[in-house]
Amino acid sequence: MKKTTLLVILDGWGYSDSDYFNAIKNANTPTWDSIWQEFPKTLINASSLEVGLPRGQMGNSEVGHVNIGCGRVVYQELTKIDKAIEEKTFGDNKAIGAAIDNVIKNDSNLHLIGLLSPGGVHSHEEHIFEMIKIAKQKGIKRLYLHAFLDGRDTPPRSAEKSIKKADKLLQDLNLGYIASVCGRYYAMDRDNRWDRVEKAYNAIVNANADFIYDSALEALEQSYARDQSDEFVIPTCIKKDGHLVKVQDNDSVIFMNFRADRAREISHAFTDESFDHFPRKKHLNINFTTLTEYDSKLKCAVAFPPEQPINTLGEVLMKNHKTQLRIAETEKYPHVTFFFNGGREEQFEGEDRILIPSPKVATYDLQPEMSAPEVTDKLVAAINSGKYDCIVCNYANSDMVGHTGNYEAAMQAIEYLDKCIARLKDAILEHDGNMFITADHGNADMMVNPETQKPHTAHTTNLVPFVYVGHKKAQVALEHGKLSDIAPTLLNVMGIAQPKEMTGKTIFNFEK
């Protein structure tokens, strides 16, 4: 019977001494409190340069899991694209050049789709603005921006500033206009809510929407009047001089998001010949280009293809003939699989995966426990089975409920998680295993912005916990650690040599 090493990633569980609308600190968490007092622990970095992001940039789930799973600082797409813009090589990119050439050759339209936001988690509006300028320089005559609105990694009603910037730039360049707006709730689903994606797709491609207005700003104002914040803006078309924009054959579409997980579904709707999740009028003959690779199965050009890291934690475990399990509910399943494996879709030999469906609710404050009880049932069974050397799991609650801005619901989510942690602790200690608890970034640790007194729905840049639960004696060996130090720590406790590609350091030393 194997002694399991378990890594528990509490998504969005940051650390803050402040009790100001801190759902984690103010929730009733007897198990977490006792673990924090009794077992070896430290705080580690999960944002900024320490995870390969620009200085001061908050971390996110994709970045966090890549850094944890790879055991090294992985420089993120945001950083790479920023560098290309800074070095003035962005416009020389082959895939972007081909998309522009297609438009010029066919005298067709260039469509930019993506999250118009300064959030820096899924996209950055500066990339969109740079793309607009390059299109003008390259001789594009008609450019249409289909703006997805944020309100999740940014304040809930903050899109006006971004829309005004985009409007002014397009007007100054006499190039085109914002042709549709849509909350990310619709265009950037990742939970197979194809009815949402269908609404976004139809607005962009067919100019078919529930609402039509004369400007993007008017669309936003009317959405607010319906009490729909940026994230939930119903897909809306913009009519200019009596004209509605559609995506037509021979057009080029460039998807400006750099993060994969919430860009996949609508990309498949654009590109799959045999797409069947909702009816399309026809399969478009277009040039579809993505800023980064969203899914290796997508048939499209990629401007910044991925670099495949070697000797990730999963690969090292496989090479050492260890069994491993990855488990999460739908919202975070790609993170413990694709992202944790450094952008690899395929399972390693000896790697099992369990996907627990996320509850079908409009927003997760309506069901703060999400699917944590079911995840825990499967986890406890896996520990008891003695089948796995290493288990990696993710609990989505503190992030997904944190994003709703509902403080009371976030506290309920934390309290549900505390009960789950109690069950895991008992199972691990009973079987003489090792459990590490950490987070990929903060979120529920600040539910209200202290400066504005408004709901804070974005991630935080706070440190995150890293705690060891087990019978081994452990001492903190590394102060000021970071997410990339977690994999070396797991290898250390498992007695496996750390490969040279892993540049992280072990956080705890364990008595032999």
From Swiss-Prot:
GO terms for cellular component: cytosol. Mn(2+) 1 binds at residues 399, 403, 459. Its cofactor is Mn(2+). Disulfide bonds: none annotated. It comes from the Bacteria. Mn(2+) 2 binds at residues 11, 61, 440-441. InterPro entries: Alkaline_phosphatase_core_sf, BPG-indep_PGM_N, Metalloenzyme, PGAM_B_sf, Pgm_bpd_ind. Its EC number is 5.4.2.12. The keyword Metal-binding applies. It catalyses: (2R)-2-phosphoglycerate = (2R)-3-phosphoglycerate. It is an enzyme of class 5 (isomerase). The active site is at residue 61. Keywords: Glycolysis, Isomerase, Manganese, Metal-binding. Pathway: Carbohydrate degradation; glycolysis; pyruvate from D-glyceraldehyde 3-phosphate: step 3/5. Substrate binds at residues 122, 152-153, 184, 190, 259-262, 332. GO terms for molecular function: manganese ion binding; phosphoglycerate mutase activity. Binds 2 manganese ions per subunit. Pfam families: iPGM_N, Metalloenzyme. One of its GO terms (biological process) is glucose catabolic process. Monomer. Catalyzes the interconversion of 2-phosphoglycerate and 3-phosphoglycerate. Belongs to the BPG-independent phosphoglycerate mutase family. This is 2,3-bisphosphoglycerate-independent phosphoglycerate mutase. It comes from Francisella tularensis subsp. novicida (strain U112).
